[in-house]
């Protein structure tokens, strides 16, 4: 078994990852500013901030990990004025890279970036072709460049797409909550394909990447389920689990009006209205990534779309 340091292990993906790694008897340490969402793993938590290099170095020195999974980041889209608000995604990454460069015993590091290094309707020609839609995406671009240019250790950069499942929060928790209350409507004549990922499959993929022989690895991966899901089919599955009926479809015009209203409410101070023009555009736009290299490495995923929906809705009903 291995010693694995997870930065940001109290977050959504990190919570599920720490749980799975511990269940396999790895020695896991979660370095995070926040307490674990799953209180069973409070004993695995060290409070610390990746922006505090001394704290971070002390953690590495005392734990002396074999592997590192760097998930810690600011992930909201609220900052619109200055990229300095996303210092964790820039200076924080620099701190992690600098420290791991001094630990030659660390076998491999996974750095989590984001699909938002490119806007949803942009198809990059390579992994270093960027088109970020906002400051968050821009901060993740800078973070990737720091890793690629400064890391002198073995690493893989992963870009989680739209991940959902137990312990999730905004925005996909909002999607499930909206479907649950019969307030989610699919636009008529819009049924896009989406490269989304159930979090337990994402954890499976991360672990495959972490422990795979070096010769089997690519330098970058999008983390997503495959094949891409059908949005209507997925929404219907969620609605059936909560409400015993399929989701409704309505014309596009009311949704456009609702999204404009959401934009206005957001400007007036409502942090998270159910629908905005940004979310509506994301909803109706195809988002499909090339998963050939990921499929070759990971093979069949452990959870089907239906199984993921059942697990997630059951968790929501009980939490």
Regions found by a protein language model. Give the residues of each.
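N-terminal Rossmann NAD(P)H-binding glycine-rich loop of SDR-like oxidoreductase domains
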Residues: 4-24
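NAD(P)H-binding glycine-rich loop region in Rossmannoid oxidoreductase-like domains
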Residues: 50-88, 102, 120-124
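Conserved Rossmann-fold NAD(P)-dependent oxidoreductase catalytic core, especially the SDR/UDP-sugar
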Residues: 95-135
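Active-site Tyr-X1-5-Lys
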Residues: 131-156
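Substrate-positioning beta->alpha
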Residues: 168-174, 188-211, 218-222
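Conserved C-terminal active-site "lid" loop/helix of NAD(P)H-dependent oxidoreductases
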Residues: 199, 236, 258-301
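Mid/C-terminal beta-alpha module of Rossmann-like enzyme folds, strongest
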Residues: 209-274, 304-305, 310-313
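Amphipathic terminal alpha-helices
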Residues: 289-296, 303-319
